[in-house]
């Protein structure tokens, strides 16, 4: 009986992995320019970390998190996002004593959502977290980092920007928003009605068409920011203007996690259709303290690799992919053994090569050489081994020339 993969757990096959290598290598290059260093945290954490950090009222914790008891009866969870685990590591290892820190991560996350295009139950994120600086110009710098990253990949993405206030101005706004939503709940979808009590801010993020007339008339937090939050937001915008980063203020932009304060932002792409968000982040100045650390401001973002890969494929960006320089075509057993020896020498010299240990018809071997994208084919048999000379075929020009086996590396390394 055939066993298929688990629903929503997607395979990334070799033909697609080149895009993933490109996304990740460019991320490492760009992040290093801004002083971010890589951290690797486990995929399994205590479930309480996300209940306290992400928020018990969020859909992630309530509906989507994979939770299980291990043999020691501890309640554990597969991480649904990367920030809480990174903050936990920052606290646990005392990194706060070293002053401001800039970290980034890459890896799989897990949410039991309904699988759809660009959204899987195991998905991969690249994220940055900066700790220890509350000033708004850090917000602008981190957003510029993400804009630089997309530009390096050749991706066009629109930046949407908002402020979600803080503990000084948000409670009064939430009370007004909740009252408005309750008064108009008859025109809202079932999910929105459920969120009114648990997480009214998330109602503003609803994409259901029938809800839009109500949401368009909803109170806006931007109009009710306290003076410190207003000043912070103005300075973030000034920083982005100074850096030449274009943005659009989006008053209904909220993030789905409870820990965000003040700056919230999102990059979207038309290439994804309705699932347009490719990256998002914001400020979380009380999260470190909430998870048991000293008061430490922070800001971070995460981008979805699956969605970004879909964009790169759609825009037709050429991906660098290392193909073998040489394919050895064996005419007989003597040639196959010599091919094995020569291939080892070329690889030690840093030259990629392949051979087919099965041998077989020369025509089939040449077809395989072209299928794997080799530049050169070297034909070897007993006569070639005896004379130390072989036929070297350029698979692009179709030209054949003799080559001394002792000079093969020099001929194919150019």
From Swiss-Prot:
Signal peptide: none annotated. The keyword Nucleus does not apply. InterPro entries: aa-tRNA-synth_II, aa-tRNA-synth_II/BPL/LPL, Anticodon-bd, Anticodon-bd_dom_sf, His-tRNA-ligase, HisRS-like_core, HisRS/HisZ, HisRS_anticodon. GO terms for molecular function: ATP binding; histidine-tRNA ligase activity. It is an enzyme of class 6 (ligase). Homodimer. Belongs to the class-II aminoacyl-tRNA synthetase family. This is Histidine--tRNA ligase.
